[in-house]
Every structure is written in C-alpha cells, then in structure tokens.
Amino acid sequence: MMFTKALVAATLATLTAALPQPTVVRREGGDAGVTIVNNMDSDVYAWSVTDGVSKMHTLSSGGGSYTENFQANPNGGGVSIKLSTHQDQTDVLQFEYTKSGETIFWDMSCIDMDRAASTFTKNGFDVSPSQTSGDCPAVNCHAGDTSCAEAYLQPKDDHATHGCPIDTSFTLTLGA
C-alpha cells in the first residue's frame, strides 16, 4: 500500500513537471515604458539611442506604433528615442528619459528639428502619462505651434523636464 501511494505521488509529480509552465519574461524597468502612436499621414522612423543606436523601427502612417520598456543606458546617461519622417535621422523629435532610483525623468525635445517645416510641428504631438501630478504632467504641443513651451526648444529649457514614478507608462501620440 505504501509503495502504491509513493508510485502515484511520483507519477503525479512527473506529469505535473511535464505540463507546460507559464513563462514570465521581465524586462528592465518592469512593464513601464513608452508607446509611440503615429496618427499622421506619413510613416515615422524610430531609433532608441543609448551608448549605441538600435535598428530602425517603422511606425506606419495611420496608427502604427512602437513600444519600449524603460531601459538604463550602459554609459550612465539617458536614453533618446529619435523620431523622424526620414530614414536617416534628420529633423528629429525626441522622447528622452533617464531612470533614477524610483523616478523616471523625461522630456520632449524639438532641438534637432526645423520646427517651422517639421511634419511633427504641423501635426502636433502629446504625451499622456498613466498617472499625472504636478511633477508628472501631460504634455501637448498643438498642431502648428512652433514655440511649444512644453518641449525643449533650446538646450537650457530645463523647465520641460518632468519626473514621474518609475512605474509610470507613457503614450506619445504623433498627430494629436
């Protein structure tokens, strides 16, 4: 009788181990990150830049998207997701972020684009955090606004940097 119980227990343990087990993949930063949605009528190209440049990602016109979980830059600096309507990283709008303890610091930068002629300026863009506060606001640069005060227009525009809890997710909508 004891042998039968042991045999049944061993058989059940073997069968349980053989069943498919759910796999959980945890990327750096957990599930928090940024999703960029292209609602414009032209394709957008994206590169994630740390101490190197990622492959180019294409966000198709009319709703194509790119999602990136927050990552740390191996050289200790921030990360820049460069967005362009050209495949050569010219005239770029940037979503920039840096992980620091329990805070994600982020901003939008228009420094490296011709604001008067840019497709991003013509169509507008906005950033919606999953949780907002005084230090973690939404950002909206309306279509045609060449002087959007909520984005970096020159290197010293530090008022455009925001700090949010590290578990905040963002949606950047192009063509808002």
UniProtKB/Swiss-Prot annotation:
The keyword Lipid metabolism does not apply. It comes from the Eukaryota. It is found in: Secreted; Secreted, Extracellular space, Extracellular matrix; Secreted, Cell wall. Residues 1-18 form the signal peptide. Disruption phenotype: No visible phenotype. The double deletion of cetA and calA results in cell wall defects and lyse during germination, leading to the inhibition of germination. GO terms for cellular component: extracellular region. Induction: Expression is inhibited by PKA activity and is subject to glucose repression. Expressed primarily in conidia. Expressed and secreted during germination and early growth. Disulfide bonds join 136-164, 141-148. Keywords: Cell wall, Disulfide bond, Extracellular matrix, Germination, Secreted, Signal. Belongs to the thaumatin family. PANTHER family: DOMAIN PROTEIN, PUTATIVE (AFU_ORTHOLOGUE AFUA_5G01990)-RELATED-RELATED, SECRETED THAUMATIN-LIKE PROTEIN CETA. Secreted thaumatin-like protein that, with calA, plays an essential role in early conidial germination with a possible role in cell wall remodeling. This is Secreted thaumatin-like protein cetA. It comes from Emericella nidulans (strain FGSC A4 / ATCC 38163 / CBS 112.46 / NRRL 194 / M139).
